[in-house]
Amino acid sequence: MALNKNHSEGGGVIVNNTESILMSYDHVELTFNDMKNVPEAFKGTKKGTVYLTPYRVIFLSKGKDAMQSFMMPFYLMKDCEIKQPVFGANYIKGTVKAEAGGGWEGSASYKLTFTAGGAIEFGQRMLQVASQASRGEVPSGAYGYSYMPSGAYVYPPPVANGMYPCPPGYPYPPPPPEFYPGPPMMDGAMGYVQPPPPPYPGPMEPPVSGPDVPSTPAAEAKAAEAAASAYYNPGNPHNVYMPTSQPPPPPYYPPEDKKTQ
């Protein structure tokens, strides 16, 4: 926890270069209790704005208060609670310890009162982010306001068509060598290359039949009947559905009396 180390001369808030503002609320009052030796900067009620980053809470006072800024890293905070009294505004309370070189010593109980609302939203988000930070995870939504070293902050770009730009995607690891890479991509915006159509099968080969036999009126009638029963689908011109093939007729043998002539 540090005193007067997170504000600029122009009244702006200063955060680390690797952090960003996840959430902020105005009209917040900060008070301290349970201190053995109360420094002048910790006396009275501070009014200002509270900010939430991925790793700490920062309070920025309004006006010429002796406490211009107050920073509380999550690892020095404990016993945080969200209170909803019957009378009065909701508030967040807890205990914080001083860090080495932070401008004060010991520990103190703090109380953040949200006079214009937002204590529940801020408190729940703070507890969630603190839990993620303790596990070494990057809090979701850590792409809010960007702050310059001078303390001036840059707002997000204006919305386009009512929607904010999406945050940068997570860099997933490359697939293993045996992973199928998928079809190749085209240079343009056409997406995937469609596979070529199957080759045209060409004319159907005549079925294999037995030895040539002399054509008879009965055989021709049988063939005509089979051709008439075939089915052709215009939607699938490469296939013709035929009935089950019948065995060829027996070979023709002349009568015995003709062999003797």
Swiss-Prot record:
Presence of the UniProt keyword DNA damage in the record: no
Region (Disordered) location: 196-261
A GO cellular-component term linked to this record: chromatin
Record PTM Phosphotyrosine, positions in chain: Y192, Y231
UniProt-reported outcome of changing Y253F: No effect on phosphorylation induced by EGF
Impact after mutating Y164F: No effect on phosphorylation induced by EGF
Paired cysteines (S-S): none
Processing after translation: Phosphorylated in repsonse to EGF as well as estrogen and progesterone hormones. Tyr-192 and Tyr-231 are phosphorylated by YES and SRC inducing nuclear translocation.
Comment text on domains: The PPxY motif 1 mediates interaction with NEDD4. The PPxY motif 2 is required for the coactivation function.
Protein name as annotated: WW domain-binding protein 2
